[in-house]
Amino acid sequence: MKSFTSRRFREMYENLPEEVKLCAKRAYQLFRRNPAHPGLNFKKIDNANDIYSARVGLGYRALGQIDGEDIVWFWIGPHAEYDKLL
């Protein structure tokens, strides 16, 4: 599976604290090796739109939408904001 990021994701990422950016990079590397790794808690959260969630460190999540064999990451932020999106 190939990963891409939206402009919104990149803007949100740039505003994250440096330690969270590091966690995001580590999570992405892990995702590239094994999307099913239990540390990512990669799961479908919206069946109708093929939207998935992945853990980024302890307090952050990233959201992506599957499009064929690709995933487009479109949101990253604190778990509290993630809960509001659901």
Where are the regions that the model predicts?
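Enriched for short, Lys/Arg-rich terminal
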Residues: 2-4, 11, 18, 56-86
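Short amphipathic alpha-helical/adjacent loop interface patches that line ligand
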Residues: 13, 28
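Secondary-structure boundary motif
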Residues: 15-18, 33
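A short, surface-exposed loop/turn module that caps and links secondary-structure elements
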Residues: 29-54
